[in-house]
Amino acid sequence: MIAYIVRRLLYAIPILIGVNLLTFTLFFVVNTPDDMARMQLGIKRVTPEAVQKWKAERGYDKPLVHNEAADGAGKVTRTIFFEKSLKLFALDFGRADDGRDIGHEIKTRMGPSLAIALPVFLLGLFVTVTFALLLAFFRATYLDFWGVVACVALMSISSLFYIIGGQYLVSKVWHLVPISGYAGGLDATRFLILPVVISVAAGIGSSTRWYRTIFLEEIGKDYVRTARAKGLSELTVLFRHVLKNAMIPILTGVVVVIPLLFMGSLLVESFFGIPGLGSYTIDAINAQDFAVVRSMVFIGSVLYIVGLLLTDLSYTLVDPRVRLQ
């Protein structure tokens, strides 16, 4: 297993380099360092001297990927790509274009992101699995039919509708919770209730429908018919046998998401004014802050690779027949 983990981590290096190169290319196809300087300076008629000063202070006065004027390794190392992207492998995030330390911002904003992502993940998993088991238990009945119809309807509604509608009804009309904002400690609870409920509601349809399909596939297998033939009740068969064997495909979609919880939610954090990593990324994109964008893309890629690795390792815990080679 150790050899497998090491091999997967080595495979991740070229993938991360490719992701960094793709992010770098896409960003600078749309923008140039001069465009970034003019946007950050916020002046319509900015002087060329001010642009050059801004670029020099932030390291954007170098060539993008190849420095002809440098000697030896400097042709590669004294470039924007090397200094802004490859240093991420040493966890050197550098500074944002506004001068703030990106590493400090990530540490500060990780707490609010987890404060909303963890409840959404745990509550959403419990609710969707419970509903899916309920529909599987009452399969081929009116409850199952209308449950599937409700799932499809919920899937068809945009997340923006849930957010805007929830803010209008719960906060503006009923005045139950604040419409947006965030506070530290236990005071954060009143700001998190609405975004957590909305996030769970937005994901119920697709997740419940997927889990229901998995449970129905397991119910049709031979071991379930054998369990029924032994006289076990339908509830016992469903919870003791079907749920256990359905954990392998469920883990595929669940474990891989766990590391990504640190990244927060882009839409929810932005609409509800939560100072997490999701809103931090959106603000950086709007400000064309490449330093922050490439850092967040890199962290997201690393967490996704870690999630895939954890998924493979979790298979061996759920199913002893699985061997990693």
Give names to the regions the model predicted:
Residues 25-34, 87, 149-178, 198-200, ...:
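Membrane-water interface segments at the C-terminal ends of transmembrane alpha-helices
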Residues 2-3, 110-143, 159, 183-325:
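Alpha-helical transmembrane segments of integral membrane proteins
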Residues 16-21, 152-163, 253-258:
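Hydrophobic alpha-helical membrane-insertion segments
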Residues 6-16:
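N-terminal signal-anchor/signal peptide hydrophobic helix marking the start
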Residues 16-76, 174-188:
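Hydrophobic alpha-helical transmembrane segments of membrane transport/permease proteins
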Residues 12, 109, 113, 149-152, ...:
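Residue-level signal for discrete positions within transmembrane alpha-helices
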Residues 9, 50, 54, 77-93, ...:
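Hydrophobic alpha-helical segments of integral membrane proteins
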